[in-house]
Structure formats: C-alpha cells, structure tokens
Design a protein with these regions (language model features):
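A generic structural signal for short, non-catalytic loop/turn and secondary-structure boundary residues
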Residues: 12, 56-58, 370
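Outer-membrane beta-barrel translocator/receptor signature
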Residues: 40-49, 55-127, 134
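Outer-membrane beta-barrel porins/channels
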Residues: 20-37, 42, 98-100, 106-499
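Gram-negative bacterial Sec-dependent N-terminal signal peptides
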Residues: 1-19
Length: 499
C-alpha cells in the first residue's frame, strides 16, 4: 500500500497543450485550424505566427478575433489479474472557449503588433474514475487481508482527479521593413501560468469475512473496520500480556519455593503469552497504519507563476514567395503553491513550495508559395528545445526535443471564398521514463480543414476543424500492462478586420 506516493503522481499532470510543444499551444487562430502551415502568413493572425510579416501589411489596423472549442480523451486500458482482465480508465477534457485576439497597426515600413491568447494548457482534465495505480493499490487490499487470515474478495472506492492548466500570453512588438522584400521583428510576451490540482480518495470499502470479528462478507468501510480490528487485537494483546505477567510472577514463587518443575512450566507459559502479546500488538499497529493509509484523503493545490519570453523574427516577401522565421527564447517560470488542503503527505504540495515550469526555447520556419493567383502551398517546421529547459519534476532529462512538420494548401474560389486544408506531424522524442498514466504525451498527426469567406474588403470570416490522431503507447507495469490512447478534436471561428 503506497497510496500517498500514488497520490503524489498528480504533480505529473502535463500541460493540456492542444497543438505542438510540451508546454505550448500553436493553435492561436481559426485560420490555423483550417491551414496549420501559417508560419509565413501576412494575414491578420501574423502577430503570432509571423510577426515580422506584419511589416508587409497595408496601412491601417488589422484585427483577428478568434474562439476555439476542443474535446479530448486520454484513456488507459489496463490488463491485470487484479481486475480479472481489462479495465478502462477514462480521462476527459472539454474546453468550451479558447479565445485569442491579434492586432496590428501598420504605417509605412513600420508595424506595431500584439496578441493575447492561451499559449499553453487550456482547460481541465478530469479523471472521474482515477488511475490504474490508484485502483491497483486499493485492489491489492483484499489479497493482503486474505494472506493475513481475513478472507476478503472485493473492494470499491471513490477516486477522482482534476488537473487544470493555463498559460495566458500577452505579447507586444514592432517590425520594420529594412528593404522592400525583408523585415525584422523584436518583441516579448508576458506569460502568466496557472495550475490547479484537485484529488479525492474516499470511501474505500472491502468485504472481509470472519465470524469472531462479526464480519459476514458484506461491504464495510475499510478505515473504521481496520481500526476496530486493531482495537480488538490490541485488547487481546493486553490480555496476553497480563497472562504473561501472572505466569512470570508464579514462576518466581515456584522457584523461591524450590519447585523447579512448576517454575519451568510457568516460565514457559509466560514466554508463550509474551510472544503472543507482542505478535498481536504488531498486527494491531500494522492495521492502524493501514487504516490511516485507506482513510479519506484530499488534495487542493493552486500554482501560479510568470515569465517573459523575448521574441525575434525575420520575414521575406518576394514576388510569389513568403518566408517567415521566428525564435522564442527559453522562458523561466517558477510556480509557487497556494495549498488549501494537503492530506496526501507529499511535501512538494505544501503551501509556499516552488517548482520549475519553463516554456522551452523554440524556433519556427514557414514558407508559402503562390503557384497561381488563387492557389497557395505552404510548408512549416517547428522545434522545441525541451531538453534545455527546466521542466516539472526534472523531466527534461527524459526529453530529447520536439519536432513538428506542417503542410498546407489554400484555394480561392467564387471570388470571396477560400478552401484550405493542412497536416501537422508532431514527434515529441520522449523516453519511456517521461511517459506515464498521468503524462500521456503521444506522437500525433493532425488534420485541419475549413473555409474563409471575405464578406467585404474589410471583413473576413474563418471556420476551421481540427482532428488529432495519436500513436498508442504500451507500458509493462508491475501489476500487468497499460495501453495509453488519446484523441483530440476541435472547431474554431474567427473574424478578421482590415481597417
């Protein structure tokens, strides 16, 4: 029984990042959902994807307002004799609204731009039925009791975990066209990080059967039952200790009277009762400890921190070719606990404790080429230097940087309509030590498609759909085998204004 250690795994809740890096959301606009390869764009969402490209916009204000909704599942299928086969543990996340706003002011060769968005995380991940390691720990109780002479065949418990993670980003910067076809950008993003972990392990019940103890095989509350049995054993230990003292006193009297045979018999009885008392007390203390382990436990911890990301970018816009390059420096974020309840005995969750939660440095490159006036092809690449960052729990030693590859196509038709689609391939390059039932970060391929409609010369609507398919991962564990599966889908709507 290592329930406190298991509850401590809550710290492994990874970012709820929806696209790309371990701690980064690159899905910042509805236009991105319909065409993921946007690192060379010069449209209204350029302040995030290609900030240097804002220098090639027309004079005036350019605004992009977006909202996205996502649905995720992170499921674990556990094969174990403890469950009599396979058991499914469901994790679900629903993000009803993920807003973002981007603004550019352009005049001459200069552009000032900024954006707000949820640049990491994005919602709450809920495990209503807990995790395999939680359930396995409870499932081991019947076997443990049976081995110690208390026949038990079943168990049940109320287990729930919820992890919430957000990184809110506010960025400002300026781009300048240094020559007709090239521009540079310098800026920074302020990041405010927020995590909230809530966990409950309650109402653990078992069905022990023992006539002497008055247990008939019905479900009973484990902690109170173990405490009652511990008290019963302690009482019996006291009786045995009392008998040992009486026989020891009798042995002394017989010895003083010269009755060696009776003295020897009394001494042997005293030793026997003394050993019995010691054994019963050990069992009583053990059950007290087990009762404490299976008693109701709660965890309620909020973590907050902030950091600043320096950003530099370059853009080239030459005839039918657009190119964008962006570098974001490593962002050091130190999270501090605000603990409401910590009944799990893990010091890392104590109030005021600090931990690392860096946003790794990253580099992005994009290329868009217009084959025809109404047909554009795009390519993109992103790289996150995960192994160089300070990640939660020193996980960087199990990470070998993330790579993403993006492909997109857009076709204009009927004057005001645009049809687009794209593919994003993400490879996290993580070792097995990084991955766990609470850190299901899996390589994936994402498909996005959608439409844009330019209602007027200054108003455009974007609609996109995003669907990620993840590679399954299997892990051999001491109690059997876990298979991890994940799926994500989302929709986005946006309005672009050119004033």
């Amino acid at each position: 029984m290592k329930l406190t250690k298991i509850v401590g795994l809550m710290g492994a809740f990874s970012s709820l990042a929806l696209a790309s890096g371990l701690n980064t959301n690159t899905n910042q606009s509805a236009a991105y959902l319909r065409n993921v390869a946007r690192y060379a764009t010069t449209e209204a969402d350029a302040p995030y994807y290609n900030p240097a490209g804002t220098a090639f916009m027309t004079d005036g204000f350019h605004i992009s307002l977006n909202s996205q909704a996502f649905w995720q599942s992170r499921n674990t299928y556990t094969e174990s004799p403890l469950f009599g086969g396979e058991k499914k543990f469901r994790g679900k996340a629903q993000i009803p609204a993920m807003p973002s706003a981007m603004v550019t002011w352009h005049r001459g060769n200069l552009a000032l731009s900024g954006y707000f968005g949820i640049t990491g995380g994005g919602g709450a991940l809920n495990y209503k039925d807990g995790f395999p390691s939680f359930d396995v720990a409870v499932a081991q109780i019947p076997g443990m009791l049976t081995q110690n002479g208390l026949e038990t065949t079943d168990h049940e418990a109320d287990i729930s975990l919820t992890g919430t993670s957000y990184i809110f980003g506010f960025a400002l910067g300026a781009s300048y066209r240094i020559v007709d076809f090239a521009s540079i950008y310098l800026g920074a993003r302020f990041n405010y990080a927020y995590n909230h972990y809530e966990g409950e392990l309650k109402n653990i019940k078992v069905n022990p059967k023992n006539e002497i103890l008055g247990l008939d095989g019905s479900m009973v509350e484990a902690a109170s039952t173990f405490n009652n049995i511990a008290d019963y054993l302690a009482g019996k230990a006291g009786e045995a200790a009392g008998a040992a003292e009486q026989y020891a006193a009798a042995a002394e009297k017989y010895a003083a009277a010269g009755d060696k045979a009776s003295a020897a018999q009394s001494k042997a009885a005293a030793e026997q009762y003394g050993a019995q008392a010691e054994e019963l007390m050990v069992k009583s203390k053990t059950l007290e400890a087990v009762a404490a382990q299976v008693s109701d436990r709660e965890l309620d911890v909020e973590q907050t921190g902030y950091g600043i990301t320096p950003i530099a970018a370059l853009a080239i816009n030459y005839k039918r070719l657009s190119f964008g390059l962006r570098f974001e420096y490593n962002t050091s974020i130190e999270m501090e606990n605000d603990t409401k309840v910590n009944q799990v005995g893990i010091d890392n969750y104590n109030d005021g404790v600090k931990s690392d939660n860096d946003i790794p440095a990253s580099i992005y490159a994009g290329l868009t080429y217009s084959l025809l006036d109404n047909l554009r092809l795009s390519l993109g690449y992103g790289h996150w230097f995960d192994s160089k960052a300070n990640l939660p729990g020193k996980q960087e030693k199990y990470a070998d940087d993330t790579d993403e590859f993006l492909y997109g196509v857009e076709v204009d038709f009927l004057t005001r309509w645009t049809l687009s689609g794209g593919v994003q391939v993400t490879r996290y390059n993580l070792s097995d030590e990084y991955l766990s039932e609470m850190s299901i970060i899996l390589d994936n391929t994402t498909f996005g498609f959608g439409l844009a409609f330019r209602a007027t010369d200054w108003l455009k609507f974007n609609l996109g759909y995003f669907h990620s398919l993840y590679k399954d991962w299997e892990e051999d564990v001491e109690y059997g085998k876990n298979t991890y599966k994940r799926e994500s889908r989302g929709v986005g709507v946006g309005i672009d204004l050119d004033i």
